[in-house]
UniProtKB/Swiss-Prot annotation:
Gene coding for it: rpmE
Gene3D superfamilies in UniProt: Ribosomal protein L31
Subunit note: Part of the 50S ribosomal subunit.
Residues at which Zn(2+) binds: 16, 18, 37, 40
Family note: Belongs to the bacterial ribosomal protein bL31 family. Type A subfamily.
Alphabetical UniProt keywords: Acetylation, Metal-binding, Ribonucleoprotein, Ribosomal protein, RNA-binding, rRNA-binding, Zinc
Known cofactor(s): Zn(2+)
Lineage: Bacteria, Pseudomonadati, Pseudomonadota, Gammaproteobacteria, Enterobacterales
Alphabetical GO biological process terms: translation
PROSITE patterns: RIBOSOMAL_L31 (PS01143)
Protein source organism: Shigella flexneri
Protein name in UniProt: Large ribosomal subunit protein bL31
Domain of life assignment: Bacteria
Length: 70
């Protein structure tokens, strides 16, 4: 194998917005900031959170106050 052709593979810290800190090994070279991780993602926690508060049709009906809409 050739020497000195592989990228540096070092330990970095991945910090989640929920406060969870994960140490991983990567070639990125700098620490990462994550939006979600396995500690706070709804799939892993079993908690469902309502991200979308309504579809486009609901917003249209609400904006123009169409009778028969929600």
């Amino acid at each position: 194998m050739k020497k000195d052709i592989h990228p540096k593979y070092e330990e970095i810290t991945a910090s989640c917005s929920c406060g969870n800190v994960i140490k991983i090994r990567s070639t990125v070279g700098h620490d990462l900031n994550l939006d979600v991780c396995s500690k706070c993602h709804p799939f892993f926690t079993g908690k469902q959170r309502d991200v979308a508060t309504g579809g486009r049709v609901d917003r249209f009906n609400k904006r123009f106050n169409i009778p028969g809409s929600k």
